């Protein structure tokens, strides 16, 4: 068949139209794909925002809710307190330490059955919303509602109030009563815990106050100067020179620096020591202890020996050691505390190293921290995290939170802990810790007399644990200005040990 020019032209145009249509389809497809891609990006963006919002709400409600509710500046707490009767705070055996009373007119007031006894540990909550201690740290749980949704609606309609959760502490009433009585009128503190778990068994500070009087007497309490402050929890916030209790750290530093021959240590004490370029450090009453090995020098609390040891310590190693023991660091605890301070640097003078070696100079510690160190020795070198809240339960008795022991970390080897235990046991059997020498529970510890001014005034310390071969309790005592033949603090500690072991 003969193809004319017109037919050829038509075929050509048809092919061109098809080609254009194909190209148009390709362009349309590309545009459609681009639009789909843009739509997907936008969709993914909004899905991402939604997921982020869900995550934020979960974190807010699960992780941060307690912190936010516990914040004293959170005004929504006032609204929560209008709907919830604050839960109880209980001792380790369920004894009530804090509860809410309601009078005939429906007015609520917080009641503390033991008055002064737990004023620093349990704390208080005032009519103005001010809170301290466990009342503050556990505010979230104490105001958490137990009721289900229907009960909450019923309460809203009737004007009734839900019951908050109850907080059970690790605190023992009998032990706390004994510690408080042993302190008497002395300023100071007692704190004790289980070395293997970190459970705080007692926490007492003096001067104290009756938590029931917060609404009438608080304005007076805040006028006291720092030395007489009743609001300061000396067990966790009081900073003191550690005195001879710091010889625990000095001894460990020497052991590590002389790991192959520290057991051959020998020092002839004539009552004082002078280091060229340093200063003269004297033993108590300039007592000449004669020849001593490291254990005996520790038991005698020989300043001459330990100031000499301090002067010879490698500064880098020493700094690393006390950093391991959390000096100048935050402590992993859920209550208010002060950081213990250590000032040794590479530029420290010989005199400062001497003073630091015996726990003087610019070293400052809290009883809490001193107890943690003793407890780590008792626990084969593992430092446990101290905690004061055992569990939280709703008003029906259902467990909401159960705290478990956790370790800060290993601060020394088991062998080092064993040697230091031997040193601390010798303090009791033949050294300065004679108050517990004949006690059947066989304690180990370290006494301390810490000079705090230029007038030969001293604080009295004791830190230790019992039994030395199977430790169940670690105790630390500080008596401000309580130095009396280094006996005062150890006698308070003895009372706590006696009570714990049933004597």
What are the residue ranges of the model-derived segments?
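Periplasmic/cell-envelope proteins involved in peptidoglycan metabolism and beta-lactam response
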Residues: 1-219, 230, 239, 265, ...
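Beta-lactam-recognizing serine transpeptidase/beta-lactamase-like catalytic domain environment
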Residues: 21-26, 93, 196-244, 249-481
């Amino acid at each position: 068949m003969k193809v004319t020019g017109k037919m050829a032209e038509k075929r050509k145009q048809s092919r061109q139209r098809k080609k254009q249509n194909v190209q148009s389809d390709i362009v349309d497809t590309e545009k459609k794909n681009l639009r789909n891609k843009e739509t997907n990006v936008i969709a993914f963006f909004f899905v991402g925002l939604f997921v982020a919002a869900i995550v934020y709400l979960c974190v807010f409600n699960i992780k941060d809710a307690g912190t936010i509710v516990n914040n004293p500046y959170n005004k929504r707490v006032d609204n929560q307190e209008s709907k919830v009767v604050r839960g109880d705070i209980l001792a380790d055996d369920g004894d009530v330490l804090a509860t809410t009373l309601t009078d005939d007119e429906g007015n609520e007031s917080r009641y503390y059955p033991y008055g002064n006894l737990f004023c620093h540990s349990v704390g208080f909550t005032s009519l103005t919303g001010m809170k301290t201690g466990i009342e503050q740290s556990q505010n979230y749980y104490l105001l958490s509602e137990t009721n289900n949704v229907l009960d909450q609606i019923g309460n809203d309609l009737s004007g009734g109030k839900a019951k908050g959760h109850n907080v059970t502490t690790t605190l023992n009433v009998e032990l706390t009563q004994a510690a408080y009585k042993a302190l008497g009128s002395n300023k100071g503190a007692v704190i004790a815990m289980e070395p293997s778990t970190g459970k705080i068994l007692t926490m007492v500070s003096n001067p104290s106050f009756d938590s029931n009087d917060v609404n009438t007497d608080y304005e007076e309490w805040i006028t006291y100067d720092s030395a007489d402050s009743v609001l300061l929890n000396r067990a966790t916030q009081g900073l003191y020179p550690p005195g001879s209790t710091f010889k625990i750290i000095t001894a460990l530093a020497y052991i590590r620096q002389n790991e192959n021959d520290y057991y051959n240590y020998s020092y002839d004490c004539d009552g004082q020591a002078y280091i060229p370029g340093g200063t003269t450090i004297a033993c108590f009453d300039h007592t000449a202890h004669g020849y001593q090995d490291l254990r005996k020098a520790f038991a005698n609390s020989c300043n001459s020996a330990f100031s000499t040891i301090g002067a010879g310590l490698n500064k880098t190693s020493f700094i690393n050691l006390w950093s391991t023991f959390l000096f100048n660091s935050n402590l992993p605890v859920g209550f208010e505390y002060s950081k213990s301070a250590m000032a040794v640097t590479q530029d420290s003078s010989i005199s400062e190293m001497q003073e630091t070696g015996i726990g003087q100079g610019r070293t400052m510690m809290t009883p809490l921290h001193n107890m943690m160190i003793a407890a780590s020795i008792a626990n084969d070198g593992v430092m446990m995290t101290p905690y004061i809240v055992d569990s939280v339960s709703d008003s029906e008795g259902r467990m909401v939170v159960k705290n478990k022991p956790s370790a800060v970390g290993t601060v020394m080897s088991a062998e080092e802990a064993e040697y230091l235990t031997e040193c601390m046991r010798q303090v009791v059997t033949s050294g300065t810790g004679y108050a517990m020498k004949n006690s059947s529970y066989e304690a180990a510890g370290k006494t301390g007399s810490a000079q705090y001014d230029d007038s030969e005034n001293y604080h009295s310390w004791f830190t230790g644990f019992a039994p030395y071969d199977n430790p169940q309790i670690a105790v630390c005592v500080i008596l401000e200005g309580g130095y009396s033949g280094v006996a005062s603090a150890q006698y308070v500690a003895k009372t706590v040990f006696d009570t714990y072991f049933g004597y």
